[in-house]
């Protein structure tokens, strides 16, 4: 009896081994298949996600490019209007009006009604430090470089005060793009809006690259990115030559665009994460430039 039970147990064990073995092998093969399928799906999903992200970035870049192009057109329109009004003002009789030179802003003359916007308007000191500089949105500042006489420049300065209302209107509507507007005459006179002080003692607009390199053809010129001598900020300038009725060059009208303000206006989508950054590139040469 006992021998018979032992034989039965042995037979049962053999049968279990025969039956379970294939099941284990099948389960192992199924697991490998599922793992391989999961890996393929993950790879395909990753590729699809990367492709979708690439397309989204291309769309964002295209939208930003269109936006920057609209801003460029706006700035050029404002600049042409500024140049036209400056030409008209310079041909008119000099009005009897107050003219505030840079030292009046340095002295914070009460009539200027100066205000401070520390996050935007700053000036660079001689030691290289940068601090907020008060500005006047109802006044232009006039600056005469070393070697020039204010008395000889005052009439043109008085004439250019006629542009203040135009500057104020443009600033109100487009202050997120336009940082500063100015007129630099061949006589050395510089008119700038909004009014501010803190000019370097040796400053002369006629020595700046955007003035010296202007083609004087009447077309708008965009200067490469550069550091502003007064604020220490990175700017790009749009400039256009001014001419008298005889066609003689008399100066340059210009608009400063702060690269910081421009980049801050280009907000990346939240889906790209907090580590995403916006940047502008300056193309100095292209392989197909002569094609």
Q: Where is each model-derived feature located?
A:
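Solvent-exposed, extracytoplasmic
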Residues: 158-174, 252-291
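Extracellular structured ligand-interaction cores
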Residues: 76, 178-180, 187, 220, ...
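Short extracytoplasmic/periplasmic juxtamembrane "stem" segments immediately C-terminal to an N-terminal membrane anchor
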Residues: 40-59, 103-108
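Extracytoplasmic/periplasmic sensory segments of membrane signal-transduction proteins
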Residues: 62, 68-216, 266-270
């Amino acid at each position: 009896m006992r021998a018979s039970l032992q034989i039965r147990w042995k037979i049962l064990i053999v049968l279990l081994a025969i039956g379970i073995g294939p099941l284990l092998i099948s389960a192992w093969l199924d697991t490998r298949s599922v793992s391989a399928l999961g890996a393929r799906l993950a790879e395909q999903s990753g590729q699809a996600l990367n492709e979708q992200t690439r397309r989204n970035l291309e769309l964002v870049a295209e939208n930003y490019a269109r936006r920057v192009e609209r801003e460029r057109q706006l700035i050029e329109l404002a600049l042409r209007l500024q140049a036209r009004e400056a030409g008209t003002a310079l041909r008119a009789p000099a009005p009897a009006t107050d003219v505030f030179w840079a030292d009046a802003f340095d002295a914070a003359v009460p009539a200027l009604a100066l205000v401070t916007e520390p996050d935007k308007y700053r000036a660079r000191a001689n030691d290289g430090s940068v601090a907020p500089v008060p500005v006047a949105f109802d006044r232009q500042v006039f600056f005469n470089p070393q070697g020039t006489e204010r008395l000889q420049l005052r009439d043109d300065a008085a004439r250019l005060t006629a542009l203040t209302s135009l500057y104020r209107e443009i600033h109100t509507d487009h202050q997120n793009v336009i940082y500063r507007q100015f007129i630099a005459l061949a006589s050395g006179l510089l008119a700038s809006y909004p009014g501010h002080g803190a000019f370097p003692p040796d400053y002369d607009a006629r020595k700046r690259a955007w003035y010296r390199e202007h083609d004087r053809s009447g077309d708008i010129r965009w200067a490469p990115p550069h550091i502003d001598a007064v604020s220490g900020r990175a700017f790009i300038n749009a400039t256009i030559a001014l001419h008298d009725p005889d066609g003689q060059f008399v100066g340059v009208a210009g608009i400063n665009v702060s690269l910081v303000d421009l980049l801050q206006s280009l907000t990346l989508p939240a889906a790209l994460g907090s580590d995403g950054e916006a940047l502008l590139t300056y193309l100095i040469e292209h392989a197909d430039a002569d094609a």
